């Protein structure tokens, strides 16, 4: 059964993950009226994907290496529904998740859920089987009101009017991470309330760096405008690690972070997480 809400996701290269996400949406007890896929790149054969359960709209954003904020804003602007659910392309939704999200969603609310992590990208989507493979069980505790400090944008539902009132994601924050922190801070400043439902999502595995040294330039370049707005640097734990390893200046907290050197190939490999612990 279709309900009047839209889903937005953005993608760059993760075709198999996107196919799995679509499969999980199709298996939901209620499905969106539309899925908006924003491709961070030019059209390709996969950007013709369709579904028998809901309408898939394909949009395109090019010109930057990783135009995350622009892509998300493009997706939200294309939504025809009052309620919009943003989902990271790596996520698989629990069959009853949308029911729970919509039962809570409304003006002034941001609704999210808990995340459990899969060790692989599955060949077939069967949520009841896959949830048993996840690193941690999906939490069953429902927090009615929470601070936005730990909010992650992997999945959230918001009213389109509330998103528009914030003017979406700030496109001055390019690339990874800092734009998410800014969006959460602006939601909190606007008086929105964060709710968490317990149905959960599963995150399909992909290699990553911890700390995210592959996004060193994004974090450093976005640090100053974030501090100018909020009075503190974002991702201070990452900046501390970057300084410890000599990639940025030691006195970054006083004079602002600056790139001192680029990580070596050996250093990059040492921080690569290639499997789920």
Label each PLM-derived region with a short phrase.
Residues 1-24:
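N-proximal low-complexity "stem/linker" segments adjacent to membrane-targeting elements
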Residues 23-32:
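Short, acidic, metal-binding catalytic loop of nucleotide-sugar glycosyltransferases
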């Amino acid at each position: 059964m279709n309900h009047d809400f839209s889903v937005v996701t953005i993608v760059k290269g993760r075709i198999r993950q996107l196919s799995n996400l679509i499969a999980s949406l199709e298996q939901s007890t209620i499905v969106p009226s539309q899925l908006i896929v924003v491709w961070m790149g030019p059209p390709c054969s996969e950007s013709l994907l369709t579904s028998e359960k809901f309408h898939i709209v394909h949009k395109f954003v090019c010109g930057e290496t990783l135009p995350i904020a622009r892509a998300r804003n493009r997706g939200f602007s294309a939504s025809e529904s009052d309620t919009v659910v943003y989902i990271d392309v790596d996520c698989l939704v629990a069959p009853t998740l949308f029911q729970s999200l919509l039962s809570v969603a409304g003006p002034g609310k941001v609704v999210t859920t808990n995340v459990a992590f899969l060790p692989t990208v599955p060949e077939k989507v069967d949520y009841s089987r896959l949830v048993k493979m996840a690193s941690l069980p999906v939490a069953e505790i429902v927090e009615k009101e929470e601070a936005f400090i730990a909010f992650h944008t992997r999945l959230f539902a918001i009213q389109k009017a509330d998103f528009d009132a914030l003017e979406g994601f700030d496109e001055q924050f390019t690339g990874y991470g800092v734009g998410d922190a800014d969006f959460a801070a602006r939601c909190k400043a606007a008086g929105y309330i964060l709710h968490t439902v317990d149905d959960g999502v599963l995150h399909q595995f992909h290699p990553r760096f911890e700390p995210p040294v592959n996004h060193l330039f994004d974090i450093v370049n976005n640090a100053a405008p974030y501090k100018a707005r909020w009075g503190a640097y974002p991702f201070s734990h990452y900046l501390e690690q970057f300084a410890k390893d000599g990639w940025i200046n030691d006195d970054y907290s006083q004079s602002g972070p600056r790139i001192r050197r680029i990580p070596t190939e050996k250093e990059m490999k040492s921080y690569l997480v290639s499997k789920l612990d």
